[in-house]
């Protein structure tokens, strides 16, 4: 297979500095919004804020820039100087280093700086320690304010810096060009802007990090150049050290954080660097190996490298080095997406006051809390995958045989405090005697120190992490007991609390209290096997192949090689276009709302009697049948499309962008995206390590420097091979743009000069653009060449995908949602004796058990029952989707998919389906949920929380997260959401003899079950994604068109529903009351919908709750609730003096000549248990066609 030729796109970018220091008076308007979006700890004056046009940068801000990174000698005698430029883009975060106290802290949790310092020491990471000489030359925020004429007590100073050069600022390799300062306007206010340039400008041909930036006599400084004062601001440097370098050091397992900063800065300055960037004396975490493998601690006496974990340690550092290099390449990328503009946010539409706008932002951020919680509490989250394990050679007899899966990432959060060992496996001095926690089966509690490590030991990011966790619940919705914060705080005044961060008055907001409240969801690291990575990403395209049959009959498959057709013509004949036409026609009939697939359209006004139900169902069936017939006719007759093979190759697919401006406007969400990308880069690099090691003397001291370029090239060669798509750009300077830079001789206070010549050092760039995630539609068995282990895994899955033969309850069938919602209109007399309330559960249970008195049914009732039964049986006979429709949109799409499956002769196995768990927000459902935000603590905590709840609209941050599920993903993905999902990357060679490594990003699962998200269900036939929509909130909305299994309340209730029966509602209510107790009264209609996925039953639950409260005179009583439930059960259990009963079992099956779905040739219920009646080679009913002719739809 030949490599596709790379086509380079030329893009023009303006020259500029590597960053700016913005200095402004603290704004009177917008400060609350800025505080909500920022990350700040209450014990610090610094903060991290998002880069937002109109809030932190001016309108027209150029995100892409050719950074002036150094100078070169030119001319015959090397006397002239030209500038060297490198493309980059501005970081999506800005760093507030003076005046951060004017921003409200992200959380009231006390002493987060102390916690981070303690955690850093405990896990062995280095602290920020400026050199004594540097402190003499500090440029303070007060000094800058004085120079710019700002009041230091009312000023806000922050750094806006390019992505590739943040570390250069951190290690003092830059200076402020004071003479080049100018003024811009942000939100109507005047703001000073001081350019920041690298010191390398004064050292021609010096493309390295300057180890001693304050040495004005450095020998590389050009002759007659006036060397400037390096920019050193201690709060800023510490902030960058903690919030930028710290997370990378944790992800790459490098305890020497300063070395990571210097390595990243060096990669930015030296575009030709090839060897190792991380230091040679890097240390490693000792941990006990997974079962059946040798320990990873000290040397295994006399054994070779692999036996003592030497190759595992080597793979760990080399993969980290390669990931750092890959991140450096991405930092030099140029992106199309501009930074988000706050004036264009749709969530502000109609919000006229500052308070209303702040409330809208608070509500949106609470949505994202659900995704943050999933990343923290999922055991395979990228945040936890910080160590490398070794599965051993693929062939124990031949160690040189390469294996893509020998080295892999494993959760390391709980073993981070283990002893550190050196390259040879010897324990590092200072770590002797430390206990070694095992990878599996440890008893460590997830504590505040672990949470600090996930944030890179940054108090600001930790504060924002707590902001989100305070808006998560402890999975109350699935029946878990959540800690009573009021009682805990009150009791703690008389007992010892294992926390020295808080006092009695601040305990309610302490990080320890928040983690205690969420204790039931803490990650439990019970496996160290190679598995999927839980990643956080962003959909930045409204296009995705997430329909029920994915990319079946897609544009690329139908396109003719001669290019004789227009794109529009081809698109009209795709499966995707057919689904759009079906949905558009149903929307015209007012049955659905395409933008909200779970909505019922105007059905409440349409279905007012049984005849209307017949009409709606028949219309849906006719619309789908017509489109499917036309689609298959076009595919078979018009295009000779191999439609059966096409189904086997169909995938659900979507792409996650690497564009940093597509992420949510929050530093912590950007951190989650960065950590996810680093995990993916390392996974790719680890897959190539064994191939690099094979046949080499890995113990050699120079091995890393010699072979790091080889590994880096191998990783780069994996681009555009199925998973990580890359884009090649040719970068040129904007036409007519003058290269302005500080004078090299006049000093840093002199104005800029524009007489420089210069060129771009990195002209052609190939950089990753997006990650492609896919899931095969059909359950595929193991291939013939698969390993025995793979075949065994597939065999274990077959039972989960096997379609059972049992007959499904009518209410759990295709029309169940309509029958429950409109029962009163369809069967107004379908109510238990003695009751005035029509009850569908009682009616259909009695009917299907042949217990319903015939006298209760009119002729019209019987005709409707026959119609419903026939549709349900016919649908069940061809159904291979393991989900019942919940609305007309799902009914139409499922029915359409099943019809296509019937044409393709699909049988036996359910197909894979997708479910989006959509993050939402609401005001706190109880006083307990608001405890962390109370202005009063200690004895006044409950009163403070109640006061907040009484005036909740005055608190823009007082929102909590919630979830709702949706089984039609295309509209969800069209909202370009932030997502969290499992990702498993397979690697394989191409055709025989080809050494090109292809990959597939497989849609996998988050481990941790209900810990990750309360609505996650253990079902192998379903793939889940957590989604927080952006379109319609922080970006323009686009129009539609063109783990471990854990029993929970959620599953218990759905099990009750699936069993059916007349008393389903009362049984569900009783189970909930017994599980949740008094918390049942706090469940709102959204909670019931999330639990039950049934609108009718949700309304019943709200009514039963109201009756229980009424029975208890406004107070909740479990006895009163159970009494109400038993009364409801007794009511629907009465059948009275039945007399002759209606025989539902025999009714409707006597007409064997009735025409089932799909016309005369389609299999009806009579064929449900038999072999298909039509020939396997002909999808339309008759025998094989004449070999001389083409297959046509009319061959029946």
Curated annotation (Swiss-Prot):
Segments for region (Disordered): 1158-1196
Zinc finger (unnamed) residue numbers: 499-512
Effect noted on mutating residue 964 to T: In strain: Nonneuroinvasive mutant HF10
Effect of residue 306 to P: In strain: Nonneuroinvasive mutant HF10 and 17 syn+
Entry-linked InterPro entries: DBP_sf, Viral_ssDBP_head, Viral_ssDNA-bd
UniProt GO BP: bidirectional double-stranded viral DNA replication; DNA replication
Gene Ontology CC terms, in alphabetical order: host cell nucleus; nuclear viral factory
Keywords, alphabetical: DNA replication, DNA-binding, Host nucleus, Metal-binding, Zinc, Zinc-finger
SUPFAM superfamilies: Viral ssDNA binding protein
Compositional bias of kind Basic and acidic residues: 1174-1196
Record flagged with keyword Zinc-finger: yes
Keyword Transferase: no
Gene Ontology molecular function: any one: single-stranded DNA binding
Pfam name, any one: Viral_DNA_bp
Chain positions of motif Required for filament formation: 843-844, 1142-1144
Stated consequence of mutating residue 224 to N: In strain: Nonneuroinvasive mutant HF10 and 17 syn+
Source superkingdom: Viruses
Required for nuclear localization: annotated span: 1170-1196
Subcellular location: Host nucleus
Similarity section: Belongs to the herpesviridae major DNA-binding protein family.
Assembly description: Homooligomers. Forms double-helical filaments necessary for the formation of replication compartments within the host nucleus. Interacts with the origin-binding protein. Interacts with the helicase primase complex; this interaction stimulates primer synthesis activity of the helicase-primase complex. Interacts with the DNA polymerase. Interacts with the alkaline exonuclease; this interaction increases its nuclease processivity. Interacts with ICP27; this interaction plays a role in the stimulation of late gene transcription.
Chain's role: Plays several crucial roles in viral infection. Participates in the opening of the viral DNA origin to initiate replication by interacting with the origin-binding protein. May disrupt loops, hairpins and other secondary structures present on ssDNA to reduce and eliminate pausing of viral DNA polymerase at specific sites during elongation. Promotes viral DNA recombination by performing strand-transfer, characterized by the ability to transfer a DNA strand from a linear duplex to a complementary single-stranded DNA circle. Can also catalyze the renaturation of complementary single strands.
Annotated protein name in UniProt: Major DNA-binding protein
Species whose genome carries this gene: Human herpesvirus 1 (strain 17)
Gene: DBP
